[in-house]
């Protein structure tokens, strides 16, 4: 699910680097074939920072908390190729590296050699641009950008995994296996931060939350055509779970406990502890 970068400009809410020249999201300004489905292609990648800023309520606040969590749970439990102790972190479904950049932001307080970050995404368009942005902004940090499907991707031992707005794009039948692989890779004391669009299971509550979400998008400049176009394109592509389903699944794969630490309309972020 993840804001991106360029040199010196900062987003006022998230305090992470963003592109100086904003490419506005106009993907759905013209009617699309009803059979068209949303994908993270070059057109989406080009406007992704604007798209996620205007489409995901609370996104900047969620990113800003990642280094705070990392400071508490990254224990330098791994050894890098140079024999130095580091904390390995995975950013799964990294998109343009927003979560990775949030961790490395100067306010996070991590030194250049304290974290080893592996950023993984299935979209070649995303990883190609993410690699450029991360290299431009954090050339001296230990970051590896990997193009891969996180299903079946082998994780090395790590202290923290970030799964932001990603699980929701996987078939429901594949989600437990992905979480199991994350749990197995985490060291004791490690955490998973899981952020997802959700639903409550109550028809009336969900209808209200969805309409307020569309109001949020209208307030951010999206037209009715854009809102309906993206809704249609995401049908059967983005499939939400309830918070209860998420927490039950986390318990099933072995996490000691999990909690919802942030919620804004129908978006929520959870942390699971090993």
Swiss-Prot record:
The signal peptide annotation in the UniProt record is: none
Which principal EC class is assigned to this enzyme?
transferase
Q: Which UniProt keywords apply?
A: S-adenosyl-L-methionine, Transferase
Q: Say yes or no: keyword Transferase present.
A: yes
User: Might you give the EC number(s) for this enzyme?
Assistant: 2.1.3.-
Catalytic activity reads: prephenate + S-adenosyl-L-methionine = carboxy-S-adenosyl-L-methionine + 3-phenylpyruvate + H2O
SUPFAM superfamilies in the record: S-adenosyl-L-methionine-dependent methyltransferases
One Gene Ontology term of the biological-process aspect is: tRNA wobble uridine modification
Q: Which InterPro entries match?
A: CmoA, Methyltransf_25, SAM-dependent_MTases_sf
One GO MF annotation is: carboxyl- or carbamoyltransferase activity
Tell me which Gene3D superfamilies the record gives. Vaccinia Virus protein VP39
Q: Does the keyword S-adenosyl-L-methionine apply?
A: yes
Q: How is the quaternary structure described? A: Homodimer.
User: Of which family is this protein a member?
Assistant: Belongs to the class I-like SAM-binding methyltransferase superfamily. Cx-SAM synthase family.
Q: Which HAMAP family match?
A: Cx_SAM_synthase (MF_01589)
Q: Which NCBIfam families match?
A: carboxy-S-adenosyl-L-methionine synthase CmoA (TIGR00740)
Question: What is this protein identified as?
Answer: Carboxy-S-adenosyl-L-methionine synthase
Q: Which organism is it from?
A: Psychrobacter sp. (strain PRwf-1)
């Amino acid at each position: 699910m993840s804001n991106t970068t360029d040199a010196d400009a900062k987003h006022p809410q998230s305090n992470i680097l963003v592109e100086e020249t904003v490419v506005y999201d106009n993907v759905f300004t013209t009617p699309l074939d009803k059979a068209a489905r949303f994908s993270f292609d070059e057109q989406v990648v080009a406007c992704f920072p604007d798209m996620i800023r205007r489409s995901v309520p609370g996104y900047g606040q969620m990113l800003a908390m990642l280094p705070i969590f990392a400071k508490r749970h990254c224990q330098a439990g791994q050894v890098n190729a140079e024999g130095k102790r580091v904390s390995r972190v995975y950013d799964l479904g990294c998109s343009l590296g927003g979560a990775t950049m949030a961790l490395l932001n100067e306010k996070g307080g991590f030194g250049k050699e304290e974290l080893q970050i592996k950023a993984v995404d299935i979209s070649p368009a995303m990883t190609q641009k993410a690699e450029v942005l991360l290299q431009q902004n954090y050339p001296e940090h230990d970051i590896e950008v990997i193009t891969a499907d996180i299903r079946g991707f082998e994780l090395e031992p790590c202290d923290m995994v970030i799964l932001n707005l990603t699980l929701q794009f996987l078939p429901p039948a594949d989600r437990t296996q992905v979480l199991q692989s994350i749990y197995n890779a985490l060291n004791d004391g490690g955490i998973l931060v899981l952020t997802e669009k959700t639903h409550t299971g109550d028809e009336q509550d969900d209808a209200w939350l969805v309409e307020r979400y569309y109001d949020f998008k209208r307030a951010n400049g999206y037209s009715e055509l854009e809102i309906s176009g993206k809704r249609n394109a995401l049908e059967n592509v983005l499939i939400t779970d309830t918070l209860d389903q998420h927490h039950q699944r986390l318990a099933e794969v072995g996490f000691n406990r999990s909690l919802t630490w942030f919620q804004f309309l129908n978006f929520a972020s959870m942390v699971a502890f090993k």
